[in-house]
Amino acid sequence: MFDNICKFLAETFPTDFATWLLGEPIALTELSPSELSLEPIRADSLILLQSEDVVLHLEFQTQPKRDIPFRMIDYRLRVYRRFPHRQMRQVVVYLQPTTSDLVQQTTFTLENTCHNFEVIRLWEQPTPDFLQAPGLLPFAVLSETDDRVGTLRQVAQAISQISDPRTQSNVAASTFILAGLILEAEAIQQILRRDVMQESVTYQVIKAEGKAEGKAEGSQEALQQVAMNLLREGMEISVVSRLTGLSIEQVQLLAQAAG
């Protein structure tokens, strides 16, 4: 769920992420992993955004994994093979505090080969960095703050200032999910307006997964129903796919069934 939400935010607010990670508001578009290789590529937590000059590779992780350094060089070489003249920035964002040494790793080394990538540990990042743009608001509560509840109130106030209803509801629902990594649901619900979140497509996914928790087949059916509802609302197949975690092919079949 956390992977899907972070991916949704990055692909919905690419300019906010470009400003944060690249230092300037570059216009970025989604780069499909299928463009990089004929071989299967693990894309569940992979985010690729591109401009004419640069490719931004993002991965959000709740837990450290030993294979991250290898994955970084693997994706770097795939992009080089496809776009040899483009620069590439690779950033791994860890969401939860941990004492594991793995979150300090920024290099893949093999004999005479050395590849570097960037790591951001959210709990070490200044909170104000995430309060200036809608797409970054959901991460503020995970940043370096001594008062997470107070920070969530700041985020809720900023969300209330978003004029577009759909953007407001999606940012609120994304904040609800990510805040759940470090705060109790009751505390979050006291601050974030449930009526705003209920209008969000991401909130629909939360409810579907919650109702089907512990039942794999039920979860799949619930997500398919959410996907059908979103398709009927006219949402694009690619957006439905990344929100629900269903594959493009699965959503295409549902779209055909929906007529």
Predicted region positions:
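Elongated, amphipathic alpha-helical interaction scaffolds
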Residues: 1-259
